[in-house]
Amino acid sequence: MPDPDKFSWSDEYLLGYGPMDATHREFVAIVNAMLGCPDAEFLGHIEAFARHAEAHFKEEDGWMERTSFPPRDCHVDEHAAVLKSVYQVIEVVRQGDFAEGRRLAAALADWFPGHAFHLDSALSQWMVKQSHGGKPVVLRRNVVAREKN
């Protein structure tokens, strides 16, 4: 089982658009619960994740549509692909294959930072520009800068 401490909230994930940051905190908490729970609780957590992801992605997709966010198609397609995988894995977990569910949870933990740093950060900047006319100002606590390769 993956170490649940590997995927916890960090200010590194803050993007500067409050509603998105709040939803991302919830995403991290639910995935972390999936990584660390016993098998008897896993189905409930993955179903909670599916409900969260449906609402999370619908909210972001709505922002992109309502504001005519230029690169929205790729972003929306990625959301749809994640949801499709989640629904497929839920069916496998219902048959008792918790290992497949845990692989999905680990994959979500691996996927989220890249998605947030690339696709969601662009959307966050867009949303702040639409509402306030400029880029978000983000104050992060205890974050060590990543080295660029």
Language-model region placement:
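Small-residue-biased structural context
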Residues: 1-149
